[in-house]
Regions:
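Conserved catalytic or regulatory cores that recognize and/or transform ribose-phosphate-containing ligands
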Residues: 1-146
Length: 146
């Protein structure tokens, strides 16, 4: 962008010139540092029951890993327990159903850890039925190739 040092009447105007130069620089900076336009959604599949507190910490780390990989993570077991009870069978079944709805919107299903729970198994089977790619990772976020 080109900023003129002179105002519309032809007089030298350093204040306006400096201000407009700074604005132009900020516009260019934003143009080249804005976040990516496309980030695929991934479903985070990891254990929840058992050691819930530790599993929540691990799942947060998995979501952080997904973001660093340029993905938008969704972990149903971080969201739904905020307002639904895992111990109530009706609410658990509803949460599992809603999780599958979200899984359907994702480009991939990422499975973490070496333990596959019953809920995880259902999510993996659903992803396979819907032809959603399933990728496996260790607890240290290293991909396991089969």
């Amino acid at each position: 962008m080109n900023v003129n040092k002179y105002n519309s009447e032809g007089y030298y105007d350093p204040t306006a010139y400096e201000a407009l130069t700074i604005i132009d620089r900020e516009i260019l900076q934003r143009r080249y540092t804005r976040p990516r336009r496309y980030m695929p959604k991934v479903y985070i599949c990891s254990p929840f029951r058992g050691d819930v507190a530790n599993n929540v910490i691990k799942t947060r780390a998995y979501c952080s890993f997904a973001v660093k990989q340029g993905r938008i993570p969704f972990a149903s077991h971080l969201l739904f327990p905020q307002f639904m009870s895992d111990s109530d069978p009706n609410e658990r079944n509803l949460a599992l159903f809603m999780a599958l709805v979200y899984l359907d919107c994702c480009k991939e299903c990422w499975v973490f850890g070496d333990t596959i729970s019953e809920g995880m198994e259902n999510e993996i089977k659903y992803a396979n039925r819907k032809n959603i790619p399933v990728r496996y990772f260790t607890e240290d976020c290293k991909e396991v190739f089969q």
